[in-house]
Amino acid sequence: MPTDITIYHNPACGTSRNTLAMIRHAGIEPEIIEYVKNPPSRAVLADLIKQAGLTPRQVLREKEPIAAELGLAGADDDAILDAMMAHPILIQRPLVVSTLGVKLCRPSEEVFDLLPPDRRRPFTKEDGEVVAPRD
């Protein structure tokens, strides 16, 4: 089974770091896109959100101060995507893409669903919590 995985990663985020470590723990070296420095195009982001079965609002980091400054509380999807393009920190992370689908991996153990079944192993997160794949 192919193991191509891409993670839209922010190294400042513990959930993103744990997700990346879980992928590597499965013996897979993913393509890492530090999306704050190298954001995806608007079309790619919109497609990732759609493939994940989410809306732009569900991928918006609403607690970021810039979200309030921009008045995104009542914004439509297009305005949210525009804001994410201008301020990539507004994109919730990590988004992970594999041959098994696309997910916003919050919590990080959501990534188990995107790993080949024979590579899903229990993992100890940064805070010491042990997580395991669902049966």
Give a label for each model feature.
Residues 2-26, 30-35:
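Local sequence-structure signature of Cys/Sec-based thiol-disulfide redox active-site neighborhoods
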Residues 1, 24-26, 42, 59-60:
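A short alpha-helix capping/helix-coil boundary motif
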Residues 35-135:
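Thiol/selenol-based redox catalytic cores and closely related redox-interacting motifs
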